[in-house]
């Protein structure tokens, strides 16, 4: 997929004569093999996790929008690619939410192909891209199940109908609305609305892969986290409530006092005896309300876990743990730990080299990025030749001498010069997926 995507993009940058030399094929081979043997992807591919499959869906969706872009001027049925993309996004939700982050890039490619460029249009397209991502992630995914759950509780508890009757009726209503929208849009010759409704429909069809969870949970498997046996309990699973809440834009710090507690949403479970849904946890006084004087903008140091508090001290030289951390200290933790240690270090593992495969916590001899150039590595990490043999000869050690990084930067500048629109779309993909 990466090979064909790169070739399509490269073909747009070079002349017809250059295409005949096969230079775009060479670029695609280098691109795809670089990714294949990159540290992050290789690690994802050999561990029992969801990230390799998630990367596959991300690559497949991006390849599909490139195919749409190539077909749209000559094929009147090219919108099938947009519907295919919606279906893939729905399917990918059942693997990992990470695949949704390709949506902004898709919106920008659509904008650049369908509309004449203007500054205002460009800004609006970027805003629409983020809003569409938020719409799918925050509204369609959770609220579809939330509404199904509310229907289920109302029809079972209030109307004394059998279990699942509310869910079935909700799906009947949803399907009826979709059919009506498709018929009306075709009757009134509105192809864009028709395509949008079809895309939404196929997004839901892909999303229905979550039914597998309900089926397996009803089989009472040994691992049955949150027990999502019906629409009512599935919402808790989808909202990842077991992970808690992390303040991103505004919120408390690790030492902020709790002033009061608010009530959360009650948890309903099936009761086979009464044939109703009963409250197993009313979640009264379950949401802490923090002292407003102890909250702030962009709180990075908010966890009360003592191990995390120790990390805050280590990465920011925080001395007084009783006072509210300053915004400067928050930014220091953000840049030193979250950006440098948790992002840039991983980035350089792929583009410069990796010291070893030992878990690193900021020390000089474990898990850092290296380049292979001693005068650079020794400035950052000290003499590498004096490390013990089990670290010097570690099988996870790689040195690329910045070659992947240099190739990437050359490609970035060349691409930006030749086709800034495509460059921005691909940058959004890179930025959102990290």
Feature map (PLM): residue ranges:
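Transmembrane-helix motifs of polytopic, lipid-linked glycan transferases
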Residues: 1-17, 59-64, 406-413
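Perimembrane helix-loop-helix junctions
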Residues: 69-70, 102-167, 171-196
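Transmembrane alpha-helix segments characteristic
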Residues: 198-207, 400-410, 419-434
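Membrane-interface alpha helices of multi-pass inner-membrane proteins
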Residues: 31-33, 81-95
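Short acidic/glycine- and proline-prone juxtamembrane loop motifs at membrane-interface regions
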Residues: 40-51
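Transmembrane-helix signature of polytopic, membrane-embedded enzymes
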Residues: 2-37, 74-76, 420-430
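Membrane-interface transmembrane helices that cradle and orient dolichyl/undecaprenyl
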Residues: 10, 14-22, 61-81, 110-119
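Lumenal/periplasmic acceptor-binding loop at the mouth of the active site in multi-pass
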Residues: 217-413
């Amino acid at each position: 997929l990466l090979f064909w995507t790169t070739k399509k993009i490269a073909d747009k940058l070079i002349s017809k004569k250059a295409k005949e030399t096969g230079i775009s094929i060479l670029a695609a081979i280098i691109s795809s093999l670089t990714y294949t043997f990159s540290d992050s992807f290789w690690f994802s591919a050999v561990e029992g996790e969801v990230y390799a499959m998630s990367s596959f869906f991300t690559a497949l969706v991006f390849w599909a929008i490139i195919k749409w872009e190539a077909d749209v001027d000559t094929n009147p049925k090219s919108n099938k690619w947009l519907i295919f993309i919606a279906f893939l996004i729905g399917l990918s939700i059942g693997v990992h939410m990470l695949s949704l982050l390709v949506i902004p890039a898709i919106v920008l490619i659509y904008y650049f192909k369908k509309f004449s460029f203007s500054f205002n249009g460009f800004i609006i397209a970027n805003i629409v891209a983020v809003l569409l991502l938020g719409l799918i992630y925050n509204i369609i995914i959770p609220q579809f199940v939330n509404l199904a759950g509310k229907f289920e509780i109302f029809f079972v508890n209030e109307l004394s109908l059998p279990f699942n009757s509310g869910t079935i009726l909700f799906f009947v209503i949803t399907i009826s609305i979709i059919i009506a929208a498709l018929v009306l849009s075709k009757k009134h010759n509105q192809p864009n609305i028709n395509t949008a409704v079809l895309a939404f429909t196929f997004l839901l069809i892909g999303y229905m892969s979550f039914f597998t969870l309900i089926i397996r949970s009803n089989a009472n498997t040994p691992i049955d986290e949150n027990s999502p046996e019906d629409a009512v309990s599935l919402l808790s699973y989808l909202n990842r409530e077991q992970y808690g809440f992390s303040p991103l834009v505004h919120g408390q710090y690790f030492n902020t006092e709790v002033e009061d507690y608010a009530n959360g949403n009650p948890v309903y479970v099936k009761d086979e005896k009464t044939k109703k849904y009963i409250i197993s946890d009313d979640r009264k006084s379950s949401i802490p309300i923090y002292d407003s004087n102890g909250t702030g903008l962009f709180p990075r140091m908010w966890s009360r876990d003592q191990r995390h508090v120790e990390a805050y001290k280590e990465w920011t030289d925080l001395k007084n743990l009783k006072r509210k951390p300053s915004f400067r200290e928050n930014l220091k933790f953000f840049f030193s730990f979250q950006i440098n240690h948790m992002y840039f270090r991983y980035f350089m593992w792929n583009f410069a080299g990796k010291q070893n495969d030992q878990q690193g916590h900021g020390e000089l001899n474990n898990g850092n990025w290296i380049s292979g150039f001693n005068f650079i590595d020794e400035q950052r990490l000290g003499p590498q030749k004096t490390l013990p043999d089990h670290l010097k000869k570690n099988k996870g050690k790689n040195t690329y001498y910045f070659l992947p990084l240099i190739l990437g930067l050359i490609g970035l500048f060349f691409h930006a010069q030749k086709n800034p629109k495509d460059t921005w779309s691909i940058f959004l993909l890179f930025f959102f997926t990290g």
